[in-house]
Amino acid sequence: MREKAEKPAKRKLTRNQRKQIEAVIRQAKGDGKNHTVQDSIPFQNMFPDGLCRLEGGTFSKTIAFEDVNYRLAGPEDQRSIFESLCDFYNGYDPTIGVQVTLDSRSGGSAADEMFGIIRQGNDLDPIRDEAVDILRMQYKRGNNGYVKTKYVTLTIEAENLPAARARFARIETDTLNRLKVMGAAAHVLDGKERLELLYNILHPEGGQFAFEWDWLPASGLSVKDFISPSSFHFGETRTFRIGRRYGAVSFLQILAPEMHDRILTDFMEADGNIMVTMHIRGINQNEAIKMVKRKITDLDAMKIQEQKRAVRSGYDMDILPSDLSTYGGAAKDLLTDLQSRNERMFNMTFLVLHTAETRQKLEIAVSQAASVAQTYNCLLTRLDFQQEDGLMSSLPLGLNRIKIERSLTTSALAVFVPFVTQEVFMGGDAMYYGLNALSNNMVLLDRKQSRCPNGLVFGTPGSGKSMSCKREITFIMLMTQDNVIICDPEDEYSPLVKRLGGQVIRLSPSSTDYVNPLDINLNYSEEENPLALKSDFVLSFCELIMGSKTGLEAIEKTVIDRAVQMIYQPYFADPRPGNMPILGDLMNALLSQHIPEADRVAQALDLYVNGSLNFFNHRTTVDISNRLVCFDIKGLGKNLKKPGMLIVQDAVWNTVTINRAIGRSTWYFVDEFHLLLKEEQTAAYSAEIWKRFRKWGGIPTGATQNPKDLLSSPEIENILENSDFIYMLNQAAGDRKILAERLNISSEQLAYVTNSEPGHGLLFFNNVILPFADDFPKDTELYKLLTTKPSEVAHETVDDEKEDQNG
């Protein structure tokens, strides 16, 4: 007897999910009358893997691709992108339809959510509110709140679903590889992503897309019910209604003999919701050649007729109508291209979709686009009586119902370059770094998502180095729970640190803020014995104060290491603050060895233990557990500044190791970074930080006006190699040349760091290079805290007054 198969358990929907489904059902039913909105959307099925069945045996898939730095590329790089674009189109045979979609639409009210700044009910809320206002203003001022996306939709014919999937597996791989060659990151949209894209197009007024695949059986709805607008109205000749919005679809008549590669860019820079669609289908090569030969034959026949007419009329038979001569020569050139120059023929339909809140705004947007078309000797013509077909052909489904086509060769087609500039617009803890100088889109990035989040800020004095660091510090404090430590050689950060509730530690012989250079915690090293790394620091410290050009001798290193082992034994036996050793303990441990080399090191330490520079011979008296700590080392004299910077670095390492244990990131900002690179010991320690911090959740940033110092030795050069974030402001001529060679900067890109305004420059992040402009609003409290211009700095006390000489 066969057992009954056990029915799978029904998935219980949450209350919120039931509400969302009921809302969709209400929208689908409307007022009880028959509605055909769903029937208008021209596809039959959407599958979870992103495969879509259109009409009959037609299937499509959509790939989203990112922008490429085309505008700022040099002539050779632009030529390379153009040739790659030619190869991209030539790679599709006539059985594959290609639809390129460029979409620009309002980001809506979701903009505030991107900034991630939420009121906390404390003293920083006024700054949070102002920061959100500034970001909102920059967002609207930059790209007017429009988000630009790019897609390519591929269409094939197949007998069934498995056959379609098998063929798309190869086509997808080839497409992704071709886009990668051009430098465009791309990914295949799954079914839910395609539905969300369609939802956003069909709901130009905005809204939240709500859909899960397992809702379909429970609700009895189809996927179209989740993406359909409330209504379509195609009763007018030249416009249509979609929900409460007005729309219009136009087609581009290409009249110019040659096109410019900026036409798509200019269309997409227009205000308003706009979507440009290019439907492209290759023509069989043999058919294309036959077609051109027929044209040549027809032109030759016309030429013969004109010559006969000339003989009968008694004038020179070589005098022909100019159009006939022109077309005849062009047709022969085209035949040569098709037969010997790797050119193919394509049919293209060019559609432009506009949507707007009112009819008046719609007409303004369409007229702006028409002006762009006229600039390039083209006509943008409304699709009279074909608005529904135009809208459905604009959807990224791969279906073209508009049979107004223009035949183009591969080169003529590739002139429609869909690239402008790369964008950095990330989610998560992404922070504001300015506006893209080419697209005016906001630059939002999260350095923690980078392979190597270490950073460098380059700029001449007055270019905005310190202000950019302060802006980043402010947003870290407002948006994350991370720790921030600042090494401040010029006392420029104190007002900001105080306002953000941080702690300023003033290191100077007259200060009572003490930091013990021998502080250690049990997590100080990833090895079992934390003394190994601490001993390395003590060796660097002793080498620095002894001032030996040849470094420590082997015996000196041995006696120092032995002393380090001795002085930490009481602390590790009983780890309480009172047992933490100080420099005096180290000197005594050296003297107790009764070895000349140990005595020599002890004598060098004496100045820092019993002499006038005994500032560091104390246990730590300040609490560096505050989220924001600034080490002000301006008051350290010439003899104390070098060891002081080394000690600050070690204190930073201590904090990083403590935070790693609790899963918290630690940001470390070093202003006037070149001061650390001048001394061998601090430079070596800096290189070690840049090499090791990433594993421990540390994110160092060095700001300097002398980038050439980073190339002074192979060891220091690693700092540049290990920095995936570079914020480059105005550069001196010599530094520009060095950086251009080292970072492969084109002359077009270099113009953005040549005599540039404060806050303007180039941003390097991972593999992206983009020009930015950060014009921070001056009539704000934040600006007064960030600026370092002497005429604009507001200080609370006389001690806080200072001049900014280094940007």
Describe the role of every protein-language-model region:
Residues 468:
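Hydrophobic positions on the alpha1 helix immediately C-terminal to the Walker A/P-loop
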Residues 1-421:
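Extended, folded cores of ATP/NTP-driven motor/assembly subunits in large transport
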Residues 457:
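Hydrophobic anchor at the beta1->P-loop junction of P-loop NTPases
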Residues 501-506, 715-728:
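A short helix-turn-beta junction within AAA+ P-loop NTPase domains corresponding to the substrate/partner-engaging
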Residues 743-798:
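Conserved P-loop NTPase
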Residues 68, 75-94, 101, 105, ...:
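P-loop NTPase motor domains
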Residues 475-485:
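Post-Walker A helix-loop "phosphate-sensing" segment adjacent to the P-loop in P-loop NTPases
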Residues 465:
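Conserved lysine of the Walker
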